[in-house]
């Protein structure tokens, strides 16, 4: 596939590095190279993004990975791999940043669960806004939180999808919630997606954990 058309909007290199490494863990070097080829990311074959927070991993490159996973493994298989890559990106790259790093402190650990979510989710959104060109907001409702990505890298440039496709973002959120809550799993459903024609990508997070 021809190289992706760059957007000029970026994630930190480190996010791209961890995502690519997490895929290599699951599918091996040859499988990863096939995905990078298919996604137009040949420049990363044997040449991973540097391990730094410089903004250098283009939104279109992240979207290209998602498209390639679906094309090679089908919607269901691609979804599972993308969720895993998203979870790995949080657990390896993000949990030690800023306010999230304090989630292991005793003062935070003893807070009630809903207080942890009220503090942790906006902190997570703020980190994305600080480290990348992704802008996210959080709104609290009675039984759920609404996480909105206003410039979504995961489905950048995609149209005509028949259902939401931002599984990497869903995985990131699932792992962030697990970390912030001290080990609980939460239901995260993408309810709106730019790839299906919506103006934004929106994720509904149930307040009550499923485990």
How would you describe each model-predicted region?
Residues 54-165, 178, 192:
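Amphipathic interaction/junction segments at domain boundaries or subunit interfaces
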